[in-house]
Design a protein with these regions (language model features):
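Short beta-strand segments
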Residues: 18, 77-78, 109-111, 173-175
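Gly/Ser/Thr-rich loops at beta-strand to alpha-helix junctions
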Residues: 20-25, 83-86, 112-117, 178-180
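Catalytic cores of processing enzymes, dominated by hydrolases/peptidases
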Residues: 116-196
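Internal, conserved structured core segments that host functional sites
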Residues: 85, 89-135
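Secondary-structure boundary elements
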Residues: 41, 96-107, 163-168, 196-199
Length: 199
């Protein structure tokens, strides 16, 4: 099972941004940058026996590999470890259940979408998948709605569970390299995130 541990009380009504390891490490790069640039405070973690037996060290101190940060009404989840396939369902479920219990205004997952000709793309485009059409207006010109296709992995399940729980959810995916880190894709997705949230 997966549990969300709040080290201190997290106020309700936040916007939640998820950065999990994925294609081009786009989500982790983008949300880690967000956390450091906004000086977000670490307020909790996600714990599970299904996750690899590891801790990350920051300032010499052990930390959970999946941590929760907060600044004003913006919360962020960053994972510094890949999520094993056997933990994906329970992790997605725990994140959305927690967001629902906290009356989250919006759950935004950010990541990459591998494209073959990435080296020829100067500025990666950002695409969006949404839980409902009313969010299209909010997107504006920040991202192009993915009309057809499919998604796999944690973000697919988070979006589906948001839909099932009637939590507003958006997944932002930037065109990226498949097999190595893509900071330009992370920058593109951050730009879209800034337009949507006004951060």
């Amino acid at each position: 099972s997966v549990s969300v541990v709040e080290r201190e009380e997290i106020p309700k009504g936040f916007t939640l941004v998820n950065g999990l390891p994925d294609v081009g490490l786009v989500g982790v790069l983008a949300v880690s940058h967000l956390v450091s640039s906004l000086k977000m405070e670490e307020v909790g973690s996600i714990e599970s026996e299904s996750l690899p037996p590891l801790v990350v060290l920051h300032g010499g101190l052990p930390r959970s590999p999946i941590r929760i940060f907060l600044k004003d009404s913006l919360a962020a989840i960053v994972s510094e470890t890949a999520v094993p396939s056997e933990a994906v369902y329970s992790l997605a479920n725990a994140i959305v259940k927690w967001a629902y219990s906290k009356n989250a205004k919006l759950v935004i997952s950010v990541g990459g979408m591998a494209v073959q000709n990435r080296q020829n793309i100067e500025k990666p485009k950002v695409f969006a998948a949404l839980t409902d059409e009313s969010l299209i207006e909010m997107l504006g010109a920040s991202a192009e709605v993915l009309q057809e296709g499919y998604m796999v992995g944690p973000y697919a399940l988070i979006l589906k569970k948001c839909l099932d729980s009637e939590v507003s959810g958006v997944t932002l995916l930037a065109q990226s390299f498949y097999n190595y880190p893509d900071p330009e894709a992370a920058a593109a997705v951050l730009e879209s995130l800034e337009k949507i949230t006004g951060i």
